[in-house]
Amino acid sequence: MKELFELQSGIYPRWASCENRTGQKGSAAMAGGGRKGSAYISVQAHSTVTLACEKGTSGIVRRMWMTLSDMSETMLRGLRLKCYWDGDSLPAVNTPLGDFFAMSTGCVYPLHSSLLSSPEGRSFVHFIQMPFRESMRIDLENTTNSNLRELYYDVDYTIGDPLGDEMLYFHAWFNHQNKTVIREDFQILPMIHGQGRFLGLSIGIICDQKRYSDVW
């Protein structure tokens, strides 16, 4: 990683947003005559929208920010974030939006960490770097029966990044069990083949209020 004062030759910043989902240079703020005339998009029930897309170059997704008009448990679990790297037909990330940002019980609360944050519990920020060699696509699927009226977001990434042989792809996996089975292990991570790094996990537990309200 270069120091802040060192020139990054051949690396260019891109910013995908509601008005410029492909992150093209000079293509944002076009809907309102040079102003932010399309600050949000709507996601209809049972539909999928592409939030960011890049082809024909290497790069690194460096930051994602989102906030929604509907922060209900149903919407946070029903919106599904999907990330595809290098043309793969299977998403490397395929998780409910709320769980991806560590809001696993459907409640939004303030969160501050080096990888994820939710300032004041009103928005979601993701700082984990997600590299790609040839292409990337980030989709959001609404699996609920309700329309999401407003989704505000931006995706910051760079293109032209030199990526060595030791580059790792970012993956995220989701598992939900209701109810858990006594004396049966809950699977946190399925069997993984190959090498990688385990960055961490978020677990949300809703206890049996009648039996364990004084324990949890």
Residue ranges, per PLM feature:
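Beta-strand-centric surfaces of beta-sandwich/beta-rich domains
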Residues: M1-W216
